[in-house]
Regions:
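Conserved SAM-binding strand-loop segment of SAM-dependent methyltransferases
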Residues: 468-481
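Conserved acidic E/D residue at the C-terminus of a beta-strand in Rossmann-like folds
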Residues: 449-454
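A short acidic, Gly/Pro-enriched loop at the edge of an enzyme's catalytic core
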Residues: 482-493
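Conserved SAM-binding loop
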Residues: 460-461
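Conserved class I S-adenosyl-L-methionine
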Residues: 420-438, 446-448
Length: 1008
């Protein structure tokens, strides 16, 4: 079978603050297909295999591996079905729950759980916004399931009767992921991915209580205990059933139970424990066996003759569960991958005993016993055993479906117009097969074929499965009625097949993303233009003026936000969140994620990763509040500049190719600050010791420990220069002192550069040029330079004894805003000064104390936001207050009520971004304060994930982009992923966002 497409990628590589050199993944249910052996009503044994790769549930003959039947779905099937009375119940990422007769695969019923929105991109696959990411459980006469991952978009807990009729439905505030469990006490236990499980009442869906957990989707019930994990450190913990008391912790990813015992496996040993003693809080080990197994485990047999099967890399071990004696180790070829899941069936009327294993590369293996009842060593392949073969660009595809030369030529012209070879493509027509085959061989696009009816869809799916392309490169969707199943602005390429198109251009063009291509049925090629006037986030704080406002009118006018895509860049390549790394960037067709030592190009329309560029050694700079931006995008989003150690790099932002570089050309200097506008680059040079660039753990620890304290040193440069965008020199200025990067701001329209220059002798003689602000202020000047020639337009002595922690400059419409802070009695006090653009003379000054106490989560280094609201007025959002930019007087933001202050509803590290009437920040979750909202609570938690510790929520291009930045987080957030939301206008709310109401049972049980 094709290699599984797991729902989530690799975890972060560790956590500096927690001294973890690795972090275990917590959601691994679909790392491999989960086999299930079950008998139908006649006693016939079926091997059921769900596929997360090619979107189906298979029934195979466990003796031969031949297919009995299959049920195709509209998305990945990630969980094994539940079986009751010869019926299999399961869900899929298409948001539907199905009941299928086991004997012949007949569909008994099918229900969509959520509102049935158009499909979005989820980790590279087109799925429902409300995927079924739990198992479907049959218990207490009901069928239970959960749909959705994002409470802001609706997550639903439902119960159907066994005929598919809705019994109850609840909208919940959790992100449900994992196998549902039940007891005879009318309770259903629900895992929530990386977070903690909870219990609900099976009668009406009421939430009863949370269960403590180290976090993770593994859960197991015994009569007296609840087991949950694996947490960050691969440990499963046991609790009393109500979760009131933790009993024991076991170093293991999986636990099996039976016959009054439990068995654990951790990669070095398998151990057996007395379950009754565990319930009393005693970890009594009955036996242990050295073993590399750490994946799935099964216990089978009679209570006095139990057998244990354990999966690991390269083998399945068969152990006497009573004594720990290794009976046999069943070898698995290494190129088959790691054995993850197991299924076993005892001998019965349907045939002999069989053991089944699946691997993370998609292999499905079966062993049959010898006459003695011991599994033999003959390996029988129950399905195609080799990993999929993907055609490389330029390799001819299926000869039997060679397209006409005219189609080949038209497709070549269309793909030449693409901004990137990667992305999503849609092919529609009465016979799309040839065009899809051609695009498979010539591009890297994920291709969607649109079928007119189920018969055509089934035929196309079988063809591409036979080519081992289905799910990996190609999927087929059926057009149901007039409504497209996809979100708009999603596809990079849409193809109308010549002479066979059944859709009009005005139906297809909305599906094409800006910059994407539509190929007409007559061969004409049309590129979709970009909308004008949308905002961008090209520099660290949006633009070189450092306003932290992208000016995006669509995001700023939003009444709500709709999920567009999630997935893509995950935590494994991102810097430790505590390092407060640089912001992501986005303009036009590009998004740039500044990962740990690499730049990653992402398509903002659908989350496709386009490229990765490895930066020179020690280019990655940390602790952004004390530094400044060193990577920026051009206004059209087509090129990206990066000041990397000894060179400034110019890259193609759409392809990741190096176009040009500029050496530093000065001994013992490195490139520092960088900004770009019009035809110019503003650059600085610094000492190699100035930035925080260490790669060793001991030094990095100071970035987390020391640099979250007060009065930390700022990164400074010694020279400033301006070049053309082609790196041609215009002018350079040897500074009269040191230039802290946070104090640099540039207005390319007005032609001015503003900076703070520290000229004291102690600064000039400093050895590292990483200097505390109080020392910089000993003899500091605010300087304004002419951008054209570098001449000093004016300078003013800057006397500011209160400036202790941080320094920011912003070029606002009303003047130059300087921000600093000091720490007093456990609280941050902020100081602001507005000065004239033309003279540097003071206009106003103010100070305020932060409303929250504490100085260990960055409370003293918040960056202010200069917000141009929808009424056209610019206001200073200096947390927690709002000020008139012109006078410095306190005021109300447009849309807010009297006595307003910004009080984030949750943990408040990180700083603000915004546009229009919307503010974005961390409040435990990525949160929007929507001042357009007519709701009583204007705050919306967009996702059950953790934002970064500085800025990673950026409004740009008519989208709200939230690339992953929580790497190293060990807390219990359900999701850890990149996100994109689209703004929804007030007039579109009813059509674009629908939240289903709760439905309660008709006959509620009497209260207990």
């Amino acid at each position: 079978m094709p290699s599984p497409r797991a729902s989530w990628g690799k975890p972060a590589r560790g956590s500096v603050w927690q001294n973890l050199t690795s972090i275990e993944p917590r959601v691994t249910d679909d790392r491999a297909n989960v086999p299930l052996l079950a008998r139908d009503g006649s006693g016939r044994l079926h091997l059921l295999v769900p596929s997360s790769a090619d979107d189906r549930l298979l029934s195979l003959d466990p003796q031969s591996g031949k297919k009995n039947w299959q049920i195709e779905t509209g998305g990945p099937v990630r969980y094994a079905p539940s079986i009751l009375d010869g019926v299999a119940y399961f869900g899929a990422d298409d948001g539907r729950v199905r009941a299928v007769r086991l004997s012949d695969g007949k569909r008994m019923w099918e229900q969509t759980v959520g509102p049935g929105y158009r499909e979005i991109v989820g980790n590279g696959r087109l799925i429902s916004p409300h995927p079924i990411r739990t198992s479907v459980l049959v218990q207490h006469g009901k069928v239970f399931a959960h749909a959705g991952l994002f409470p802001s978009q609706g997550v639903y807990s439902v119960a159907f009767d066994r005929n598919g009729e809705l019994v109850w439905r609840r909208k919940i505030e959790s992100s449900s992921q994992g196998y549902l469990l039940a007891t005879g006490k009318n309770r259903v236990y629900v895992p929530t991915g990386r977070s903690v499980p909870y219990a609900l009442d099976s009668a009406d869906g009421r939430k009863l209580f949370d269960l403590p957990s180290p976090g993770g989707s593994f859960c197991m019930l015994t009569p007296d205990l609840f087991f949950t994990g694996p947490g960050n450190a691969s440990s499963v913990e046991s609790y009393t059933e109500k979760g009131r008391a933790r009993m024991l912790s076991f170093k293991a990813r999986h636990v099996a139970a039976g016959g009054g015992r439990i068995w654990t496996a951790n990669g070095s040993r398998i151990a057996c424990h007395d379950l009754a003693k565990v319930a009393e809080g005693q970890q009594t080990t009955l036996w242990q066996l050295e073993s590399k197994s750490q994946n799935g485990m099964l216990v089978t047999g009679e209570p006095q003759n139990l057998r244990l099967f354990a999966a690991g890399e390269g083998s399945v071990e068969f152990v006497n569960a009573d004594t720990g004696e290794l009976i046999q180790s069943l070898a698995v070829p290494r190129d088959y991958g790691e054995v993850i899941n197991l299924a076993v069936s005892a001998k019965g009327e349907g045939g002999e005993e069989v053991l089944v294993a699946t691997t993370d590369r998609g292999h499905l293996l079966a062993w049959h016993p010898s006459r003695t009842g011991t599994p033999g060593t003959d390996l029988k392949k129950a399905a195609p055993a080799r990993a999929p073969v993907v055609h490389s660009p330029g390799v001819p595809a299926d000869d039997s479906a060679r397209p006409k030369q005219s189609l080949v030529d038209s497709l070549a012209r269309a793909t030449e117009r693409l901004q990137s070879a990667s992305g999503f493509g849609l092919v529609e027509g009465r016979n799309p097969r040839a065009a899809i085959e051609q695009l498979v061989s010539t591009t890297k696009l994920q291709l969607v074929g649109l079928a007119r009816n189920e018969e055509q869809a089934r035929s196309l799916r079988e063809h591409f499965r036979s080519r081992q392309l289905y799910g990996l490169r190609v999927i087929i969707k059926r057009l149901e009625g007039d409504r497209f199943p996809f979100e708009s602005n999603l596809f990079n390429l849409v193809v109308q097949c010549p002479e066979s198109s059944f859709l009009a251009e005005d139906q297809l063009l909305p599906l094409v993303c800006e910059g994407g291509v539509l190929m007409h049925s007559d061969g004409r090629i049309r590129s979709k233009p970009f909308r004008e006037g949308l905002g961008s986030w090209r520099h660290q704080y949006a633009d070189p003026s450092n306003l932290a406002d992208s000016g995006d009118p669509e995001v700023g006018n939003a009444a709500a936000f709709k999920l567009k895509w999630f997935g893509g860049v995950g935590p494994s390549r991102m810097p430790d969140r505590h390092f407060r790394g640089p912001a992501p960037l986005s303009a036009g067709p590009a998004m740039i994620v500044q990962a740990d030592g690499v730049l990653i190009g992402v398509d903002p329309a659908n989350g496709t990763e386009r490229w990765q560029y490895q930066l020179p050694e020690k280019s990655m700079r940390y602790v952004t509040p004390y530094d400044g931006g060193y990577v920026c995008l051009t206004e059209n989003g087509e090129q990206v500049y990066a000041a990397c150690n000894e060179r400034v790099l110019l890259l193609d932002a759409l392809k990741g190719k190096l176009l040009k570089s500029l050496p530093v050309d000065v001994g013992e200097r490195r490139w520092g600050y960088l900004a770009q506008g019009k035809e110019e680059l503003v650059l600085t040079r610094m000492k190699p010791s100035a930035p925080r660039i260490a790669t060793d753990r001991k030094t990095q620890r100071t970035f987390v420990d020391q640099d979250y304290r007060s009065e930390r040193p700022l990164v400074c440069s010694r020279e400033i220069l301006v070049t053309g965008t082609d790196f041609g020199s215009k002018w350079q200025r040897e500074s009269l002192g040191l230039i802290p990067h946070g104090g640099i701001s540039v207005d390319f329209e007005e032609g001015r550069v503003v900076l703070v220059e520290a000229r004291s002798q102690s600064c000039l003689e400093h050895s590292t040029d990483r200097i505390p602000l109080a020392l910089l202020m000993e003899d500091a000047f605010l300087v304004c330079l002419d951008l054209d020639n570098g001449e000093t337009l004016w300078e003013k002595k800057l006397v500011w004894p209160e400036a202790k922690n941080v320094l920011y400059s912003q070029l606002t419409p009303e003047g130059i805003l300087l921000t600093s802070s000091e720490s007093l009695s456990g609280k941050a006090r902020y100081h602001f000064r507005m000065l004239s653009h033309s003279t540097g003379q003071p206009v106003w000054s103010l100070q305020h104390d932060h409303v929250k106490g504490g100085l260990y989560h960055g409370e003293q280094v918040h960056h202010p936001l200069v917000l141009r609201q929808n009424d056209g007025v610019c206001r200073l959002m200096a947390e927690p207050f709002c000020y008139e930019l012109k006078t410095g007087k306190k005021t109300l933001p447009s849309g807010m009520q009297k006595d307003w202050t910004l009080r984030r509803p949750g943990h408040s590290c990180g700083t603000l971004s915004g546009c229009g009437n919307c503010l974005f920040f961390r409040a435990s979750f990525p949160t929007v304060l929507n001042m357009n909202s007519k709701q009583s609570n204007p705050f919306t938690a967009l996702a059950p994930s953790r934002p970064g510790c500085w800025i990673n929520i950026i409004p740009a291009g008519g989208r709200l982009l939230i690339p992953e930045a929580s790497a190293s987080c060990v807390c219990k957030y359900s999701l850890q992923t990149s996100l994109c939301f689209e703004p929804v206008a007030e007039a579109e709310l009813d059509s674009e966002i629908s939240i289903l109401p709760d439905v309660l049972p008709k006959n509620l049980p009497s209260p207990k």
